[in-house]
Amino acid sequence: MARSLKKGPFIDDHLMKKITKLNSEGKKTPFKSWSRRSTIYPDMIGHTVMIHNGKAFVPVYVNENMIGHKLGEFAPTRTFKGHGGDKKVAKK
């Protein structure tokens, strides 16, 4: 279910403070964030955010096409090992 338009996008306050501080200083250093639920907004373009996937931090470089999506969409939490192979044993 989509978020109501009257509410607007959700951004954690601590993440907003980090971005505004980096933008005011003119720095583009990567920073860690556990906030997978925050929406990507235009001030984040050009920054590298290290998103936690439950085990490690995944570097995500933010560009224009990501605006409006959640940060967690770009840091997968599950590793796909592949479907089962052919279980038939070949006769020799």
UniProtKB/Swiss-Prot annotation:
Name of the protein in its database record: Small ribosomal subunit protein uS19
SUPFAM superfamilies per record: Ribosomal protein S19
GO molecular-function term, one example from the UniProt record: structural constituent of ribosome
Alphabetic keyword roster: Ribonucleoprotein, Ribosomal protein, RNA-binding, rRNA-binding
Gene3D superfamilies reported in the protein's UniProt record: 30s Ribosomal Protein S19, Chain A
TM spans (from-to): none
GO CC terms of this entry: cytoplasm; small ribosomal subunit
Gene for this chain: rpsS
GO terms under biological process: ribosomal small subunit assembly; translation
Superkingdom of the organism of origin: Bacteria
Entry's family note: Belongs to the universal ribosomal protein uS19 family.
Reported function: Protein S19 forms a complex with S13 that binds strongly to the 16S ribosomal RNA.
Disulfide bonds: none
